[in-house]
Structures are given as structure tokens and as C-alpha cells.
Amino acid sequence: MSFADTLKTLPAITHLAALELLDESGATIARIENKPGKAGSLAVYAALAARHGRIDVAAAREGLELFAEHTADARSNPGKHPNIDRLFEVIQSGATLGVRTIAA
């Protein structure tokens, strides 16, 4: 399934302004805003957070599947897709990221 098709299956994110990712100490390490060019990543991360309660290795693996064709592009072009790169990092390090949603 393509990323565009996958997005159609994910819960709506109209109620979200952003999502923050937190390190193990609770500090914000990233913010994904609900704006053009980022809304797809927000939808993926919000769905992962709803299913897993956090972004851990299992959630990151699922996220790479959800990002579909963009995952291969991210592997070939490190830095081009920072929200996918972050999932690779979680898998490699075994880290767990907390998630805080910001209402619209």
C-alpha cells in the first residue's frame, strides 16, 4: 500500500495542532506540527502513539511500514526524512520516546 493510501486508513488529526516527542527524562526532543509537508508524519506518529502509548521499537517498526515507499527513500537519503530517520534511531538504540499531543 502506498503512503497516500495508508494515510486514508489512519485516524483524523484535525483535532491536533502538533505532537511532541519526549526523551526518557520528559524533555521535548522534537515537535511535529499539523501543517503542509508534516501532516502525514503527524498522522503516522499520532496513530502509533494511540496504538502503543509511546514510540518504542515495536511502534517504530510499524511506523516504517506505514511510511511505505518513503522508508526506502529515507534509507537511501539520510536526513531527507527526519521523522523516518528518528524511527530508525529508535530501532537501533532501543530508546523509548514519550508522546504529548497538542490540541488545535
Indicate residue ranges for each PLM-predicted region.
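Amphipathic alpha-helical interaction modules
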Residues: E20-V57
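Generic structural signal for hydrophobic core residues of well-folded globular domains
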Residues: L10, L48-I55, T71, I91-G94
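Short, compact, well-ordered microdomains
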Residues: R61-A104
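Short, charge-rich, low-complexity alpha-helical interaction segments
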Residues: A4-A27
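Generic hydrophobic, helix-prone segments enriched in Leu/Val/Ile
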Residues: L7-L10, A59, L66
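Context-gated lysine
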Residues: K8, K35-K38, K80
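A generic short-segment signal for beta-strand/edge and adjacent turn/coil regions
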Residues: H15-A17, A58-A59, T71
